[in-house]
Structures are given as C-alpha cells and as structure tokens.
C-alpha cells in the first residue's frame, strides 16, 4: 500500500519507548520547509528522553506558508521538541503564515515543547492553532512567545495580526481553550507593557496540580524583568501561565526557570528524586 503524499510544510513525528526505556523515533514524515535533526539523547538527568530540533532552511515563514506539525508520544516516551532559532514571520501578498500543531501524549509519556520566539515583521500576519490531547498520566509542557517585532531594526508592533489559539483535551474531553489576538494600533494594545508576551501551558492530569501551581508562582515571583500570573485549569488538569517581559534575556531566563520548576515537580530526575 502506497503511503500518502507528504504535503509541503508537513512534519509528522511519532516516538516510542524501547525495552530499555529510551525514547526512539518510530516514524517521521517531513517536507520543506520543516525538517528535524537526528534524535539526540542529551539530557543527563533523564537519559531516556530524546531531543528533536525543528529546522527551517527558508529562514522563516512566508505569507503563503501553511505548516502542519503532528506529534504523537506513545506510552513511556519522553520528547523534547524545540526549534533552531526564533521564527521570523515575513510580510507578503498572501493571506498570512499559518501553522497548525496537533500533539498527542499517551499515558506515561511526556512532551516538552519550547520553540523559539515568534518575531513578526512589519505588516505580517501569523495564525497558529495548537491542539493538545493528553491521556491521564501523561504530561505536556508547552511554551509560546511572541516579540513586538524586529526590535533591533526599530520595528515595534508594526505587524498586522498575531493570532494564536490553544485547545487542550484530557482523555478526549476539552478542558481548556485560549486565544490571543494581537492587532497593533487598537486600544487593547495599552494592556501590553512589554516587548515580549509568553504563555506556559502544563497539562498533567492525575498530578498534584496545587503543588505545581505553588512552585510555578514562586518561580515567577522570584524572577526579574518579568510580570505575570498563573492559575489552574478546570478539573485540576494542569496550569496556565502568562507573562510579559521587556528584554529577551529576561524572557529566556523565565522560560528556563519555569520549565525547571515544572520538571522538578512532575519529572524528578536522578538528581531530584
């Protein structure tokens, strides 16, 4: 039987755990401009986890790009999914760049998704939808961040639209939805006091969410150069956190600290158990 044609911009990943507990790629479908590196086992505290880095030879995403990313983490697997750098969003005559991401995390699996910051250029449009499906006993740690523009070029909130929507499901049932639409030039822009806006979504059904929430709030309070807040998802399915940062180093440090805090609570490694 012939496999379906791989569409432009398609990236499909399925990871499994082998008999030794190491995560391996079971299937991979990819087509320009989305490519991934070879699997890397580089987490000393969780040697079974694998890291995949998404690379874009095009240097960014264009106004007629339609990207689709599908990831499935099977029982016992642990995947770090990241990108090589920030996502540059170019302006053009098309309807705007679009990216749909669909993540499935089975019981006993973990997916950590931390792409680089989205940097929309002047007059560009970027639309993103993320669907997260987690079974009880699974874990999703997801991050997204958007910059005010190409700040080094003097571009600040000159883009047309940034539209990002998230739908989280647990055992097939929707537990949370979020959508942020930023249109520079509107009155609502007065609510944004920094040059970077970021979101952390943790879906961990069956975990101690109250302990996780306390730890993440403490980490956020201890951080410098950022401000934000965190709350629990319905049905104690996880935690939602949003923050604003003025500087890129502060944003990066906040992401590093928040992920480390979540891992200590939910994924104790050999140095943390």
Swiss-Prot record:
One of its GO terms (molecular function) is nickel cation binding. It comes from the Bacteria. Coiled coil: none annotated. InterPro entries: UreD. Keywords: Chaperone, Cytoplasm, Nickel insertion. Its main location: cytoplasm. One of its GO terms (cellular component) is cytoplasm. PANTHER family: UREASE ACCESSORY PROTEIN D (PTHR33643:SF1). HAMAP family: UreD (MF_01384). UreD, UreF and UreG form a complex that acts as a GTP-hydrolysis-dependent molecular chaperone, activating the urease apoprotein by helping to assemble the nickel containing metallocenter of UreC. The UreE protein probably delivers the nickel. Required for maturation of urease via the functional incorporation of the urease nickel metallocenter. This is Urease accessory protein UreD. The gene is ureD.
């Amino acid at each position: 039987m012939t496999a379906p044609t791989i569409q432009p911009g398609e990236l499909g990943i399925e990871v499994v755990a082998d008999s030794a507990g190491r995560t391996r790629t079971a299937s991979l479908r990819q087509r320009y401009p989305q490519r991934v590196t070879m699997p890397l086992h580089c987490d000393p505290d969780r040697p079974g986890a694998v890291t995949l880095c998404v690379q874009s030879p095009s240097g960014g995403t264009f106004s007629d790009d339609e990207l689709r990313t599908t990831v499935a983490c099977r029982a016992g697997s642990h995947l770090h999914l990241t990108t090589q750098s920030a996502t540059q969003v170019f302006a053009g005559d098309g309807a705007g760049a679009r990216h749909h991401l669909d993540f499935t995390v089975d019981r006993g699996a973990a997916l950590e998704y931390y792409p680089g910051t989205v940097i929309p250029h002047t007059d560009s449009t970027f639309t993103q939808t993320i669907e997260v499906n987690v079974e009880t006993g699974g874990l999703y740690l997801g991050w997204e961040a958007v910059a005010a523009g190409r700040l080094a070029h003097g571009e600040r909130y000159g883009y047309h639209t940034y539209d990002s929507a998230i739908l989280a499901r647990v055992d097939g049932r929707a537990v949370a939805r979020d959508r942020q639409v930023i249109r520079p030039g509107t009155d609502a822009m007065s609510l944004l006091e920094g040059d970077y806006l970021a979101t952390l979504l943790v879906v961990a059904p069956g975990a101690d969410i109250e302990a996780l929430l306390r730890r993440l709030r403490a980490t956020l309070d201890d951080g410098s150069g950022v401000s934000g807040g965190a709350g629990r998802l319905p049905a104690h399915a996880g935690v939602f956190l949003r923050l604003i940062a003025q500087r890129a180093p502060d944003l990066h440090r906040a992401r590093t600290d928040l992920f480390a805090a979540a891992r200590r609570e939910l994924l104790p490694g050999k140095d943390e158990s």
